[in-house]
Amino acid sequence: MSLAIDLEVKKDVLCIRLQGELDHHTAESLRASVTKAIEENGIRHLVLNLEQLSFMDSSGLGVILGRYKQIKQKNGEMIVCAISPAVKRLFELSGLFKIIRLDESEQYALHRLGVA
């Protein structure tokens, strides 16, 4: 299975919607796409919608953590939303929810960032 990446810019927020599998085969493509979008659009915040993400491994966690650090340097925030139970468990085990906020829906996350 592959990874479909949908990126949408809303003011200074980049919405990232992932569908499929985020693993060592697809992580570099996501990293490059998101980094380019952040740099080209003056992005300060990320909303990561994982509702359609069926699988993620440590490579995926690494990409997400790297983008979190990139956004933090801009005094921004990353919000994960609409996460599947299996991927949520991986986030919990890795401790990422200690630094990255989880919201129920993309709409709610955008509202909290003032762009909905």
Swiss-Prot record:
* PTM field: Phosphorylated by SpoIIAB on a serine residue.
SUPFAM superfamilies given in the database record: SpoIIaa-like
Superkingdom to which the source organism belongs:
Bacteria
- For the keyword Nucleus, the answer is no
User: Start and end of every STAS domain?
Assistant: 3-113
Q: Which Pfam families match?
A: STAS
Phosphoserine is found on 58
Give one GO molecular function term.
anti-sigma factor antagonist activity
UniProt keywords (A-Z) are:
Phosphoprotein, Sporulation
Q: Does the keyword Phosphoprotein apply?
A: yes
The family database entries (PROSITE patterns) matched by this protein are listed as: STAS
| Biological process annotations from GO | sporulation resulting in formation of a cellular spore
InterPro entries named among the record's database cross-references = Anti-sigma_ant, Anti-sigma_F_ant, STAS_dom, STAS_dom_sf
Q: Which NCBIfam families match?
A: ant_ant_sig, spore_II_AA
Q: Member of which family? A: Belongs to the anti-sigma-factor antagonist family.
So what does this one do?
A: In the phosphorylated form it could act as an anti-anti-sigma factor that counteracts SpoIIAB and thus releases sigma f from inhibition.
Q: What's the name of the protein? A: Anti-sigma F factor antagonist
Query: Gene encoding this chain?
Result: spoIIAA
